[in-house]
Amino acid sequence: FSASGDQVYALSEFVEGQDYMIAQPTEQLRAAGEMLGRLHQQLHGFQSPIEPAWQPMETEIAAQLKDRLARLQSVVGDSETHPVSKHQIALWLDEVNALIENCQLSIVKNGQLPREWVIHGDYRAQNLKFDGARIRAILDLDTARPAERLFDLGYALVFFPAVYQDVPLTSEQQAIFLHAYESTCPLSETERKLLPSHLKLAFLRGITLWLDLYYFAGMRERTGPWIQSYLRCVNEVVGFGGS
């Protein structure tokens, strides 16, 4: 590590490895699900010698989503040239409030989702290196933080192949990933009931990020196909957790 003013720089070792193979993903999906379970299991209960003032993850996500959706409301329109309508943005705003409340109430009511988990924060194929069907390296750990593990698992189930392919995982591929994860780090009944809400939250986090890049960062050509594909598949993608 090297510090310069208020900036801290980290030099990471180069790791040889292969990218995610979208043509034959089954074994890599299985390996990735198992590795995420191992990561959560190994870091469960970890106590850092430094205690940053972390806000609850759901609080950060709620603020992030409300800010993005408010920005989007000012630029989206109802013509076919826009990927989403103002009405859809309004519906998502209402859904954010309901989803966050559901997560918070379940945590308070059940007391079975300890914050002793440490999550990766952006566990996707783009942040993994493979050696055939094995995981060679997990990258970009700068997003790691204490939080309920469902935030990691839900985001991975929805956005694991993002950037490498325009379309999300199928429900069958999600099942492969989840089964492999639970073979190492099983979910509790409380967590199973909350998984659908976390899938929806994950979808909203990703789709609003892409829409933000689409409208405000000059990335329409890049993000447009992703947005269209995920909107077409939204029911299958976020409905998986309830099956």
Regions found by a protein language model. Give the residues of each.
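A cross-family kinase active-site recognition segment
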Residues: 22-91, 116, 228
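ATP/Mg2+ or Mg2+-diphosphate-binding catalytic cores
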Residues: 71, 76-78, 206-243
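Mechanochemical coupling/switch segment within NTP-driven translocation systems
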Residues: 86-106
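Active-site acidic catalytic loop and adjacent metal/ATP-binding pocket
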Residues: 101-151
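All-alpha amphipathic helical-bundle segments outside canonical DNA-binding/catalytic cores
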Residues: 187-199
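Short small-residue beta-strand/loop micro-motif enriched in glycine and branched aliphatics
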Residues: 18-22, 137-138, 163
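Active-site activation/catalytic loop segments of kinase-like enzymes and analogous catalytic loops
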Residues: 150-185, 201-218
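Conserved structural core of kinase catalytic domains
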Residues: 1-29
